[in-house]
Curated annotation (Swiss-Prot):
Post-translational modification: Glycosylated.
Crosslink (Glycyl lysine isopeptide (Lys-Gly) (interchain with G-Cter in SUMO2)) position: K24, K683, K794, K868, K874
Protein name: Kinesin-like protein KIF18A
Biased composition (Polar residues): 681-690
Length: 898
């Protein structure tokens, strides 16, 4: 980005911008006095040819009163017409001189022109169209970021205005500031504050605050007329990062100036303060014009330049004719209302082209003190280490590149040709493979869509049957059958095509195996060459990428189909629910609502509220009638590409194949399996045996599964089965007897113990629990494995007296399913402890010395009268050996104590 002095233009660069006409000028019908010819030439007050004819002859009518057109041609460095944008002005004015600014040259951009010509709009702009100042700051910091690795850059800014020949700081509240001249620094404003922003956002914030403090008042010519000259200056200091005793520091200054417009009191209507402001503005602009005339007059040498006639010209001393590269933006109006102002602006701009500057880069050679030598040496050492690391990385990369080049040269020409041939074959194979796979996924999506549409047709027909009359149902049935037949035919066709695509895919896979085998023959060890192996892997990855993208597209299509059906269902529900509520309220007010209707309405309310139902861990709750709609996981699952089986002669197992993912039915997890699920079979290992621990054997443990009598209604209430763990037997202990005339329960006690608990049968053997279940036919159907158990010498089968299981208050078990509250009551009462034997008598020969606890079902007459099927469970404990004491966990529930 270095710029030499020979490359720079020593003349002031002048551009002209013509603003568009405003609504007021268009309404008045003023003619234009500025005509833009091209990007460099414009004509002021062009001639208008008026040709008149009288009786077919040309006549020249000379109007003596009419003023002759000047028809002046001006040539500038750039001319912007009415359609130009802020970015175009920035690209041709400020952006080119930023290179000079970064190389240490002072630069100035000033906007000159009459009031209302568009100077402030060009320099500052608006929120929608930022001006030159804003764009300059953004581009400057962008350039600084590009060179931050080579140079250390620091910036400082100041913002002032010249108002009524007084200088004020726009960034802080201060009084008038004095202008002084320094032999080294040049023109200096004493007391002007400098701010050091860290980013372009911060510097733009400072610029915005300064614009708010600037003096502006409306006049007859301009609603937002600037009453002062604004000067925004940026100081840039650059220093090389390379540590050295002699440091080269570049210091440059850029000035962005927005001048106030010249005006006439007769046209602007200025009075009082506005008149004084206009006078001072014209005075400073007149001094500026004189300076421009003096600098442009090359005939007179050593001529005095009147810089001190105004504060403005004193500030612009460096910018005009000094060590500065200056660009003037002359803003003019095309309307004839500003005829004189436009002419004067163009005249001064044309003279400013002749101003020459003496450009010199501001580079200072700073000699560091001897005390800084140690710091400089350390910085140089760190820089040397950094450069060595970069050089080492470069050499390693170069060596790796050389090895690859040598490896390529070592490959013989015939082998290269073979590799190229196989690469072409792989391209053709995978291109065909990709087409087959895409077609297969498309067919799979169409089949899923066909399945969904079939289900939606059936669902719609069911709704019509529930809602419409018989005639409409008959018509709908005909339409449904016709559509289902079409869908079925379509499905058969799609399935046939899918099978064909699968066959083609298998053929492609076989060809791929053959090609892999042939590629393995290229090397002596039977492995595929690295080049071909990489190509093969890339082809597989590309195929997987295409496959996943296609699956995503198909999923979106299916989701849209489901969303459409969901919206239709939602519309039906939104129409039905208010109608149902209205009918319910009407029937209730008329007294026509019965208990069944109330129950149905409450059930619908629960469904609408989405309330959850509490169930036991192993309880199989009555599920509503399932529809045939496949789950979302099934619909959104496509056959995936699995790895191809590796071939024997090739070590690489690249390739893909179609693998169908089996869909698993979602099941509810159980905390502990029920002992009635047939877990104690011979096929199950000992580690999977059912643990039949008593719920009260270890302090407080809740029942982890629902009692069978509460979970399911009995088929034969006169027979039950008792399951009990024993510590002395490893097989089943069956006890059966006939029922008596008082509907006593027939009980068959089958005792089983898991293998993993044979060594842990200490005190817990006393904590046994009987579980009532069905017997005879139902038990034979449920546990067929029990009949096939081997009866070895260790198995003991004992028949006990049925009178020992007779109960005092025995009654048939109700056949209906108990309510949730009944199940909860049964669970609570299961933990009750009754040590007396007055309620029930349990007599048995206990030769092994263990305790038994029997749960019985009792119900009171009061409950029978109220038709509430509640079941009481009482425990009866037989006489046990005094040395064996039963331990129970305490339950702090009040409902368990009587």
């Amino acid at each position: 980005m270095s710029v030499t002095e020979e490359d720079l233009c020593h003349h002031m660069k002048v551009v002209v911008r013509v603003r568009p006409e405003n609504t007021k000028e268009k309404a008045a019908g003023f003619h234009k006095v500025v005509h833009v010819v091209d990007k460099h030439i414009l004509v002021f007050d062009p001639k208008q040819e008026e040709v008149s004819f009288f009786h077919g002859k040309k006549t020249t009518n000379q109007n003596v009163i009419k003023k002759q057109n000047k028809d002046l041609k001006f040539v500038f460095d750039a001319v912007f017409d009415e359609t130009s944008t802020q970015s175009e002005v920035f690209e041709h004015t400020t952006k080119p001189i930023l290179r000079s600014f970064l190389n240490g040259y002072n630069c100035t951009v000033l906007a000159y022109g009459a009031t209302g010509a568009g100077k402030t709009h060009t320099m500052l702009g608006s929120a929608d169209e930022p001006g030159v100042m804003y764009l300059t700051m953004l581009h400057l910091y962008k350039c600084m970021d590009e060179i931050k690795e080579e140079k250390i850059c620091s910036t400082a800014v100041s913002y002032l205005e010249v108002y009524n020949e007084q200088i004020r700081d726009l960034l802080v509240n201060s009084g008038p500031l004095a202008v002084r001249e320094d032999t080294q620094k040049g023109v200096v404003v004493h007391g002007l504050t400098l701010h050091q922003p860290k980013s372009s956002e911060e510097i733009l914030h400072l610029l915005d605050n300064g614009n708010k403090n600037r003096t502006q008042h409306p006049t007859d010519m301009n609603a937002t007329s600037s009453r002062s000259h604004a000067v925004f200056q940026i100081y840039l200091r650059q220093q090389d990062k390379t540590a050295s005793i002699n440091q080269n520091v570049r210091i440059a200054k850029m000035s962005l100036i927005d001048l106030a417009g010249s005006e006439r009191a007769s046209t602007s209507g200025a009075k009082g303060t506005r008149f004084v402001e206009g006078t001072n503005i014209n005075r400073s602009l007149l001094a500026l014009g004189n300076v421009i005339n003096a600098l442009a007059d090359s005939k007179r040498k050593n001529q005095h330049i009147p810089y001190r006639n105004s504060k403005l010209t004193r500030l612009l001393k460096d910018s005009l004719g000094g060590n500065c590269q200056t660009i003037m933006i002359a803003a003019v109006s095309p309307s004839s209302v500003f005829y004189d102002d436009t002419y004067n602006t163009l005249k001064y701009a044309n003279r400013a082209k002749d101003i020459k500057s003496s450009l010199k880069s501001n580079v200072l050679n700073v000699n560091n003190h001897i005390t800084q030598y140690v710091k400089i040496c350390n910085e140089q050492k760190a820089e040397i280490l950094l450069l060595k690391e970069k050089l080492k990385a470069y050499e390693e990369q170069k060596a790796f590149t050389n090895e690859n080049d040598q490896a390529k040269l070592m490959i013989s020409n015939p082998q290269e040709k073979e590799i190229e041939r196989f690469q072409e074959i792989l391209n053709c194979l995978f291109q065909n493979r990709e087409e087959i796979r895409q077609e297969y996924l498309k067919l799979e999506m169409l089949l899923k869509e066909n399945e969904l549409k079939s289900f939606y047709q059936q669902q719609c027909h069911k709704q019509i049957e529930m809602m419409c009359s018989e005639d409409k149902v008959e018509k709908a049935t005909g339409k449904r059958d016709h559509r289902l037949a079409m869908l079925k035919t379509r499905r058969s066709y799609l399935e046939k095509r899918r099978e064909e695509e699968l066959k083609q895919f298998d053929e492609n896979t076989n060809w791929l195996h053959r090609v892999e085998k042939e590629m393995g023959l290229l090397s002596q060890n039977g492995h595929i060459p690295k080049e071909l192996k990489k190509d093969l892997h890339c082809h597989h990855l590309h195929l997987q990428n295409k496959d996943l993208k296609a699956q995503i597209r198909h999923m979106m299509d299916l989701a849209c189909l489901q969303e459409q059906q969901h919206r239709q269902t939602e519309a039906v529900l939104n129409a039905l629910l208010p109608t149902l509520r209205k009918q319910y309220c009407t029937l209730k007010e008329a007294g026509l609502s019965n208990a069944a209707f109330e129950s149905d309405f409450k059930e619908i309310e629960h469904l609408v509220e989405r309330k959850k139902v509490v169930v036991w861990a192993d309880q199989t709750a009555e599920q509503p009638k399932q529809n045939d709609l496949p789950g979302i996981s099934v619909l959104m699952t496509f056959p995936q590409l699995g790895p191809v089986q590796p071939i024997p002669c090739c070590s690489s197992s690249g390739g893909t194949n179609l693998v169908k993912i089996p869909t698993e039915k979602r099941t509810r997890r159980k905390l502990m399996p029920s002992p009635l699920k047939g877990q104690h079979t011979l096929k199950s290992p000992p580690s999977q045996s059912v643990q039949l621990n008593d719920s009260l054997s270890k302090e407080l443990q809740p029942i982890v599964y629902t009692p069978e009598d509460c979970r399911k209604a009995f088929q034969n209430p006169s027979t039950v089965t008792l399951m009990k763990p024993s510590s002395f037997t490893t097989s089943f202990q069956a006890i059966s007897s006939n029922i008596n005339s008082d509907n006593c329960l027939k009980m068959l006690c089958e005792v089983a113990i898991p293998h993993n608990r044979r060594k842990e049968c200490g005190q817990e053997d006393l904590d046994s629990t009987f579980t009532i279940c069905e017997d005879i036919k139902s038990s034979k159907c449920k546990l067929p494995e029990q009949e096939s158990l081997p009866n070895d010498n260790k198995d003991i089968l004992q028949r006990l007296d049925p009178s020992s299981f007779s109960t005092k208050h025995s009654m048939p078990v109700p056949s209906m399913v108990p309510s949730y509250m009944a199940m909860t009551t049964a669970a609570k009462r299961k933990r009750k402890l009754t040590s007396s034997t007055s309620n029930s008598s349990l007599t048995a020969d206990v030769n092994s010395g263990f305790a038994k606890r029997v749960r019985q079902d009792n119900s009171s007459e009061k409950h029978l009268q109220e038709n509430k099927p509640t079941m009481e469970h009482k425990r009866n404990i037989c006489k046990i050996n005094p040395s064996m004491v039963r331990k129970f966990g305490r339950n702090i529930s009040k409902g368990n104590l009587r």
